[in-house]
């Protein structure tokens, strides 16, 4: 059957099984700390910690990524299975209960395809993500990095890390966004880092060779690439304000896309006239876009009455299915209780197709990309990518800078 049964429908089906299902489930699995492992390859495992909790008759889970705690309220426990549907993203775990100590099954990420899955195991154990030993090098600080060196897909990055004994946290910044909350350990000459947030399933492994750390980056079970990095306090990337721009012959942005109810919305609509308008090019499947959306929610609540409008243009991974695109974006809007409008720009996230929808731009290089328009309708800044809370002080400086910029535009 091509159509995946949603967790909501599944919940209704299981509810019909009656009280026996609930009581059996309670004896099979207990609340507490668990360790999940995603089998990315025959040798590489991505581990992370999960807390399973029960409030009255409602189960919930908390996924831990360094300083990030992801609360999951769509958790269904049956006589022999555990289902965990991730918030916002179109993904879930389906796990069979093998004993009180172990479950097995898979993680499904439907935004990557109806059949995309990663084998998964869940253990009743609270332990560190990685085996640790005495570290033989210090990773604390900034690192100049290159991924897919000398290959067609080569791109630069900056690693920013903090180290306490053998424990490491931090992230990589790229010109399209950061790799969010990474957590791991230095074990002798080796480094291991991981992140799981319901969309990203990232694993980094490497070892020091002289002054260079060389390793491999895995994203789920569909992608891997080599990387190297050297410590460099001055490591930097190109300015995010220089990458996306208006093509020659254009002086304005224009568009008309349907909102979640199907009503066409255009930048030329009366409601956007004499307003500062922030255009957010994004997707509901994108963790960096989620980080940005959480910040934009704060900005909208703070500045809307002063004349700020925010409009999100969603490019969805829904395989051309407009209805699915609308449902996925509506899920994001509902979960975050967002008040600014979201438009379906395309039911596909292909960047070339996205650029065709906005032909005045040189390219769509990243989800997200943000366009700042003043009260006269002139583009004042275009910011490519987003470095979120996982980047620490870099994110705080960005937020301070752009809040000042918005206030300047509102005052003009």
Task: Indicate residue ranges for each PLM-predicted region.
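Thiol-/selenol-based redox modules, centered on thioredoxin-like
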Residues: 366-412
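Structural micro-motif
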Residues: 337-341, 357-371
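Structural microenvironment flanking redox-active thiols in thiol-disulfide oxidoreductases
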Residues: 291-337, 348-355
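C-terminal motif of bacterial Sec signal peptides marking the signal peptidase cleavage site
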Residues: 14-15
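Sec-dependent signal peptide recognition
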Residues: 2-7
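N-terminal "domain-start" segment that seeds a small globular fold
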Residues: 232-269
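Central antiparallel beta-sheet cores of small beta-barrel/beta-sandwich binding domains
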Residues: 28-96, 129-130, 137-208
């Amino acid at each position: 059957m091509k159509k995946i049964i949603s967790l909501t429908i599944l919940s209704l089906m299981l509810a019909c099984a009656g009280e026996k299902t609930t009581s059996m489930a309670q004896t099979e699995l207990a609340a507490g700390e668990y360790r999940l492992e995603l089998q990315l390859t025959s040798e590489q495992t991505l581990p992370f910690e999960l807390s399973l909790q029960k409030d009255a008759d409602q189960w919930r889970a908390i996924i831990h990524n360094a300083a990030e705690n992801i609360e999951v309220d769509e958790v269904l426990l049956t006589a022999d299975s555990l289902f965990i549907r991730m918030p916002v993203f179109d993904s879930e775990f389906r796990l069979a209960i093998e004993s009180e100590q172990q479950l097995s099954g898979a993680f499904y990420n439907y935004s990557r395809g109806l059949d995309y899955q990663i084998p998964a195991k869940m253990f009743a154990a609270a332990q560190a993500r990685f085996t640790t030993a005495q570290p033989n090098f210090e990773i604390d600080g900034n690192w100049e990095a290159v991924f897919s060196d000398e290959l067609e897909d080569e791109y630069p990055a900056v690693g920013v890390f903090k180290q306490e004994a053998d424990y490491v946290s931090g992230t990589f910044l790229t010109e399209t966004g950061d790799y969010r909350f990474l957590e791991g350990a230095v074990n002798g000459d080796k480094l291991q880092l991981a992140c799981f947030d319901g969309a990203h399933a990232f694993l980094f492994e490497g070892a020091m060779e002289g002054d260079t750390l060389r390793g491999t980056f895995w994203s789920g079970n569909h992608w891997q690439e080599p990387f190297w990095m050297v410590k460099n306090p001055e490591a930097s990337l190109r300015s995010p304000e220089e990458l996306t721009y208006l093509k020659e012959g254009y002086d304005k942005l224009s568009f008309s896309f349907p909102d979640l109810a199907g009503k066409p919305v255009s930048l030329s609509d009366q409601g956007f006239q004499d307003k500062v308008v922030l255009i957010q090019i994004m997707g509901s499947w994108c963790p960096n876009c989620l980080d940005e959306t959480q910040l934009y929610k704060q900005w909208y609540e703070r500045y809307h009455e002063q004349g700020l409008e925010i409009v999100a243009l969603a490019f969805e991974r829904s395989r051309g299915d407009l209805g699915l695109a609308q449902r996925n974006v509506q899920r994001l809007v509902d979960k975050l209780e967002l008040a600014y409008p979201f438009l379906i720009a395309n039911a596909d996230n292909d960047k070339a197709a996205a650029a065709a929808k906005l032909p005045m731009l040189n390219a769509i290089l990243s989800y997200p990309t943000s366009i700042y328009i003043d009260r006269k309708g002139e583009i004042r800044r275009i910011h490519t990518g987003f470095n979120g809370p996982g980047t620490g002080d870099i994110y705080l400086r960005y937020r301070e800078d752009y809040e000042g910029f918005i206030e300047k535009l509102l005052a003009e």
